[in-house]
């Protein structure tokens, strides 16, 4: 019984430590990763760029992705 309780406490501590590390900012979003909820978490030398998305003339969201700095994307027609 003590072993089960000890194992549960150890697992809880490990999960808490992982969550604390993610919240502390050590984990960054890689290139082309979505950054809509945390635009300041892109890795070094990467910016969080957002664009408006429309469906049938109505705004349907604002997705954001980590992209290279000083890179400009143009619409291909």
Curated annotation (Swiss-Prot):
Source taxon at top rank: Eukaryota
Tissue specificity as recorded in UniProt: Expressed by the venom gland.
Subcellular location as annotated: Secreted
Principal localisation: secreted
Gene Ontology CC annotation, any one: extracellular region
Processing and modification events after translation: Contains 4 disulfide bonds.
Presence of keyword Secreted: yes
Keywords: Disulfide bond, Secreted, Signal, Toxin
Molecular function, one GO term: toxin activity
Signal peptide: 1-20
A Pfam family this chain is assigned to: Toxin_35
InterPro entries in UniProt: Spider_toxin_CSTX_knottin (IPR019553), Spidertoxin (IPR004169)
Residue ranges annotated as propeptide in the record: 21-26
UniProt record similarity statement: Belongs to the neurotoxin 19 (CSTX) family. 09 (U10-Lctx) subfamily.
Name the record gives this protein: U10-lycotoxin-Ls1b
Organism, as annotated: Lycosa singoriensis
């Amino acid at each position: 019984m003590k072993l089960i309780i000890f194992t549960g406490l150890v697992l809880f501590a490990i999960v808490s430590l992982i969550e604390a590390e993610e919240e502390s900012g050590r984990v960054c979003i890689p290139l082309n990763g979505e950054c809509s909820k945390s635009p300041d978490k892109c890795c070094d030398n990467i910016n969080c760029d957002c664009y408006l998305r429309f469906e049938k003339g109505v705004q349907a969201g604002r997705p954001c992705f980590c992209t290279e700095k000083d890179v400009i994307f143009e619409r291909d027609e």
